């Protein structure tokens, strides 16, 4: 009978696998890539919200043109020459100017209002982001949308 060889510690621990440092490097790389991805995604979201608000402003402008052809004056939320966008003014635009056709729903990130523009007897549409200081302004005299405090 052959004698049993004793297994030494160095022979027993020769298991193959990834060292801890390699696993930590992989986890760090995945963390960095996900942080960059989340930052880029939030930029895409805010950009798409702004574009959606610009399209809504253009729809309101077209409704204003139709309202003017029927009434010989522009519809507005207030008799003042400026307004403060809110959920109330947005709802009034939908119910009175748009005839109940909801272009401003709960998913819209901006609140809107319409005021008269005394400079050219036209109108101004303002849109303010609900959770940031971004404000979009449309003037009927220039038909341009200007942005302030928007990233």
Task: Place the predicted regions along the sequence by residue.
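Generic N-terminal leader/processing signal
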Residues: 3, 12, 48-49, 124-128, ...
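Membrane-proximal amphipathic alpha-helices
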Residues: 42-57
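Periplasmic/extracellular, small/polar-rich flexible segments of pilin-like filament-forming proteins
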Residues: 62, 66-151
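Conserved catalytic core of two-component sensor histidine kinases
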Residues: 27, 54, 61
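Enrichment for repetitive, rod-forming helical segments
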Residues: 9-12, 31, 37, 57-58, ...
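N-terminal leader/signal peptides at the extreme start of proteins
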Residues: 1-18
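N-terminal single-pass transmembrane signal-anchor helix
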Residues: 13-41, 45
């Amino acid at each position: 009978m052959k004698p049993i060889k004793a297994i030494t510690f160095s022979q027993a621990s020769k298991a193959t696998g990834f060292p801890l440092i390699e696993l930590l490097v992989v986890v760090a790389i995945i963390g960095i890539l996900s942080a960059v991805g989340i930052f880029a995604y939030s930029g895409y979201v805010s950009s798409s919200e702004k574009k959606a608000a610009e399209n809504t402003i253009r729809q309101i402008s077209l409704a204003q043109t139709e309202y003017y052809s029927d009434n010989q004056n522009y519809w507005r939320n207030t008799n003042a020459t400026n307004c403060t966008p809110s959920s109330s003014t947005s709802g009034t635009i939908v119910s009175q100017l748009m005839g109940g056709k909801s272009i401003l729903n709960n998913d819209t990130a901006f609140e809107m209002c319409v005021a008269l523009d005394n400079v050219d007897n036209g109108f101004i549409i303002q849109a303010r982001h609900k959770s940031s200081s971004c404000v979009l302004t449309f003037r009927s005299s220039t038909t341009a949308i200007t942005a302030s405090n928007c990233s």
